[in-house]
Amino acid sequence: MSEIVNGRGSGIVLLCRAGFEGDCAAEIQDKTAELGVYGYCQTQPEQAYVTYHCQHEEAEHIARKLTLKDLVFAREMFALLGPVKVAGIEDRASEVIKVLKPHQETFGLAGELRVGTPDTNEANQLSKFCRKFSVPLRQALRKEELLSNKPLAKRPMLHVLFVNPAHALVGYSYSYNQTLHNGGIVRLRMSKEAPSRSTLKLDEAFQVFVPENEHEKRVHSGMKAVDLGAAPGGWTYQLVRRGMMVQAVDNGPMAESLMETGQVKHIQEDGFKFRPKRKNVTWLVCDMVEKPARVGELMTSWLLEGDCEEAIFNLKLPMRQRYAAVKGYLDQIKEQLQTEGTKPFEIQAKHLYHDREEITVHLRWLPRS
């Protein structure tokens, strides 16, 4: 059991995929060092979260300044106020309040409460308990004027993370620096019409990388798209269901159901050699099993040469030192865009819920203001 559960503590809690704790820890150490904070990480294999220990004031600084969307391996992040031991205690809500009360000046009146668990089979068995416990806890927090009577989207959120049945970690996050989804998990249903499960990666990517209020403008019917390495059509399916006209590039066969829509043109060609005849492509997507540096260079060249406006693609991860590798891939892309490009750009990367041994990257030119 980690030290943070057994004792007092402040810091940052980060949730990640089980098995990627070391990568999440390496990333938070690197990013906080850039902020001038030098804490230390504590985690265990397969526990699906990392605790970064630092002073309370430093945790507050990180919670405000380190953007969740700039972290690749962290799904959710909150500033830790302290651990709670609830084993054998009937009034668990009071124990949570004891941790929160001394720090109320930090977060003021919270606008929402999130009770959850790390994403492990053992912890997920507590999901039903978390839903039930949320009701009396919410009432108790409102009575103590720690939580607003109605959800307030612009106020901080309180977090109670049950790491096992006996212990929880309590903290807060700011409204501008949190995920819409509990645990950062975007749960999606697999469509019967989709040719492969890989379709869920692109579906999630659109939801994570494109803000909901920009979907109508940036992801809509009638757009032109290209899918490199498309067969059998898992990613093409997501473009088709959004009403796009797609050039699916792959020497392999495409699902007949997609070809019957009339929205797909199958081009049997090498994805690394193909280029569209016209400069009217909005979206480029790619899920090819290739060397990450090679894929990154290809995607960057499409943007630089005006062959697309936005790109979503996967980069396969090595078995070891994954964060160092990812940083190298992304730095290479940034350097190429900064050196050869003439416009401001945005790059986002995330180890999505539906990703396994890969990360998903989004690139786009930013509109000139």
Swiss-Prot record:
Its main location: cytoplasm. S-adenosyl-L-methionine binds at S198, A231, P232, G233, G234, D250, D270, D287. SUPFAM superfamilies: S-adenosyl-L-methionine-dependent methyltransferases. The keyword Chaperone does not apply. It comes from Idiomarina loihiensis (strain ATCC BAA-735 / DSM 15497 / L2-TR). It comes from the Bacteria. GO terms for biological process: methylation; rRNA processing. InterPro entries: RlmM_FDX, RlmM_THUMP-like, RNA_MeTrfase_FtsJ_dom, rRNA_MeTrfase_M, SAM-dependent_MTases_sf. The active site is at K316. GO terms for cellular component: cytoplasm. Belongs to the class I-like SAM-binding methyltransferase superfamily. RNA methyltransferase RlmE family. RlmM subfamily. NCBIfam families: PRK11760.1. It catalyses: cytidine(2498) in 23S rRNA + S-adenosyl-L-methionine = 2'-O-methylcytidine(2498) in 23S rRNA + S-adenosyl-L-homocysteine + H(+). Its EC number is 2.1.1.186. The keyword Metal-binding does not apply. GO terms for molecular function: S-adenosylmethionine-dependent methyltransferase activity. This is Ribosomal RNA large subunit methyltransferase M. Monomer.
